[in-house]
């Protein structure tokens, strides 16, 4: 029931050193490969939709008439920070975490699965009435990255990746008919495929964890002896963390899983992690060991957070040497990530973050493990490996690492880490899922592109039953009630991010997004959330999310493997479903017998 398309890129021929009419030599490499761009394209009279895995998932209805919109064109696994930086200030919305796409036409559908070359792929989708009369979706593979170098006195020229991607491109097309030919059927079939290929593994427990993020230290400018200095401000000390854990367990919350960010020296912008030293402003090494042991001995789990893919500050005494260990852009400049000044739109170079080359990950992870083991933690949180993927275009001999090779490197290091610890990640790109127990910051929305018509919880349908997952922290979203309903619809666990410090301490810092993180202010809401919603999660946690339906405007139904369903009403008025009244901005839990 499938078609396998393989393109051996190494065998592609293109003109090399051909002579033009002026006698000059030129080489014309293949930059992009589009695979079956009109495969099963839908016509003007067809009904159905295109599935794009944008964020949680989204549908583009066939012939939707939005001919004024841009073509959907997004990179699988999001932005590569070694590519040319944007020439204008932009936001990067939800990214693609799964290399899959689909199209439904009448009672037939196909699912496209990118098996090889996923890290260098873009997904392109468009509707009829623009370029032609077809609705279509296809993958486009960037086998040679290109960039632009601007000259000092005007003009520019193109520059290309030193080495061509040499792996295969492989796309599998799976066909669905009848009742299976919808996005729920696509999600089930893709989940089966991932399980068969060892990319998803069953959950270890059927007891839903209560997820809480603690913010340890963050950089804040303080005036010391008349001189402004950036110091790690202690938002949650190790003693504070123990007090918060005790308070939650005393309130009846069980199976508390703590993600502890900013515990390492330097706080959230921690030092190069070749060592696992604690931030002194939070407490001593002995106190941190005691905290880890205490949480684990009292029925909880702790996931100290670390980022391996970037360096916030390069010190002379650490193991990072920028000229050797930093990733390079195509123009051989060290790759850096910038914040942009909202008034001038200029990059703020003082706060630039250096991108670490995938080439050094094996050495870096080995060094970290050796030092981190002394704390006795059974868990580890990876702040970047689950969503960020960067190349290294260093032109040194044998030093170029394309994005596909980078994905393999990250996957190998995650495998090593998962052999020792339970892993928590952000985002949840596919290559990270085989080694992950918990995924946080999972998208519950799509990017909101104009061409898209409907968001769906496709990602959650795929990973349900095989990973615990949660969306954004409920205390950091603009409408926590609506976001909680979205979490219920998707089977996503509630998630909070708190600190012992008052919220105003982040004012005027890069971390003012934590403007509502004081634990004391959120404590009652956290306990109420647990008491109201965890009886629901005890019924659906560990169950496969097998069917999702759009019942009417603002009303959805999610059905799980054990027959339990959740009907969510997003409207500002009450509705009735199957004889059951559901209040405005409310939900209803239906058990297998319809009660």
Language-model-detected regions and their locations in the chain:
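A structural signal for short, well-ordered beta-strand segments and their strand-loop junctions
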Residues: 6, 255-260, 302-305, 380-382, ...
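Intrinsically disordered, low-complexity acidic/polar segments
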Residues: 14-17, 42, 267, 313, ...
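Carbohydrate-recognition beta-sandwich/jelly-roll modules
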Residues: 1-237, 242-256
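Conserved, mostly hydrophobic/aromatic
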Residues: 7, 248, 295, 383, ...
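Aromatic-lined carbohydrate-binding/catalytic grooves of carbohydrate-active enzymes
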Residues: 206-293, 297-363, 387-391
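Active-site-proximal substrate-binding groove within the catalytic cores of carbohydrate-active enzymes
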Residues: 106-108, 116-124, 129-131, 308-311, ...
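A mature extracytoplasmic/lumenal domain signature
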Residues: 9-13, 262-264, 308, 384-386, ...
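Short loop/turn motifs at secondary-structure junctions
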Residues: 29, 252-254, 374-383
């Amino acid at each position: 029931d499938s078609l396998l398309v393989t393109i051996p890129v190494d065998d592609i021929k293109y003109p090399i050193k051909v002579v033009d009419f002026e006698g000059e030599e030129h080489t014309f490499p293949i930059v992009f490969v589009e695979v079956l761009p009109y495969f099963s394209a839908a016509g003007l009279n067809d009904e159905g939709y295109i599935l794009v895995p944008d964020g949680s998932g989204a549908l583009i209805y066939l012939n939707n008439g939005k001919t004024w919109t841009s073509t959907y064109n997004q990179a699988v696994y999001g932005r590569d920070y070694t590519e040319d930086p944007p020439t204008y200030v932009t936001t990067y919305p939800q990214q693609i975490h799964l290399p899959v796409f689909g199209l439904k036409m009448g009672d037939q559908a196909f699912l496209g699965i990118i098996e090889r070359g996923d890290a260098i792929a873009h997904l392109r989708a468009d509707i009829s009435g623009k370029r032609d009369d077809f609705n279509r979706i296809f993958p486009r593979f960037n086998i040679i990255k290109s960039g632009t170098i601007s000259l000092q006195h005007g003009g520019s020229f193109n520059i290309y990746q030193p080495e061509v991607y040499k792996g295969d491109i492989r796309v599998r097309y799976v066909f669905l008919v009848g009742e299976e030919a919808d996005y729920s059927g696509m999600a089930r079939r893709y989940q089966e495929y991932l399980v068969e290929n060892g990319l998803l593994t069953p959950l270890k427990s059927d007891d839903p964890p209560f997820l809480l993020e603690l913010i340890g230290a963050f950089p804040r400018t303080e005036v010391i002896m008349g001189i402004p200095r950036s110091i790690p401000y202690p938002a949650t000390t190790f003693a504070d963390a123990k007090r918060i854990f005790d308070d939650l367990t005393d309130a009846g919350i069980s199976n508390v899983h703590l993600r502890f960010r900013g515990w390492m020296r330097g706080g959230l912008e921690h030092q190069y992690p070749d060592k696992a030293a604690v931030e002194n402003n939070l407490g001593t090494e002995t106190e941190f060991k005691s905290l880890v042991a205490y949480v684990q001995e009292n029925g909880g789990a702790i996931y100290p957070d670390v980022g391996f893919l970037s360096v916030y500050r390069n010190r002379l005494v650490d193991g990072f040497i920028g000229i050797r260990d930093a990733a390079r852009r195509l123009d051989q400049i060290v790759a850096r990530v910038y914040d942009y000044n909202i008034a001038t739109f200029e990059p703020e170079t003082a706060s630039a973050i250096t991108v670490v080359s995938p080439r050094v990950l094996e050495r870096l992870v080995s060094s970290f493990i050796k030092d981190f083991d002394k704390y006795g933690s059974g868990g580890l949180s990876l702040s970047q490996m689950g969503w960020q993927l960067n190349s290294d275009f260093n032109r040194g001999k044998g030093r170029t690492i394309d994005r596909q090779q980078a994905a393999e490197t990250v996957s190998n290091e995650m495998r090593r880490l998962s052999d020792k610890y339970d892993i928590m990640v952000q985002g949840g790109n596919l290559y990270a899922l085989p080694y992950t127990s918990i995924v946080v910051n999972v998208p519950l929305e799509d990017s909101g592109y104009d061409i898209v018509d409907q968001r769906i919880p496709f990602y959650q349908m795929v990973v349900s039953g095989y990973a615990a997952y949660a969306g954004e922290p409920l205390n950091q979203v603009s409408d926590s009630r609506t976001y909680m309903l979205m979490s219920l619809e998707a089977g996503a666990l509630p998630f909070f991010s708190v600190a012992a410090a008052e919220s105003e301490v982040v004012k005027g810092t890069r971390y003012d997004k934590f403007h509502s993180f004081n634990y004391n202010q959120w404590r009652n809401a956290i306990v109420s959330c647990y008491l109201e919603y965890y009886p629901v999660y005890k019924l659906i946690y560990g169950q496969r999310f097998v069917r999702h339906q759009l019942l009417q405007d603002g009303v959805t139904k999610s059905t799980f493997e054990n027959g339990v369903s959740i009907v969510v009403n997003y409207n500002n008025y009450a509705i009735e479903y199957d004889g059951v009244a559901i209040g405005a901005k409310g939900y209803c839990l239906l058990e297998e017998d319809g009660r």
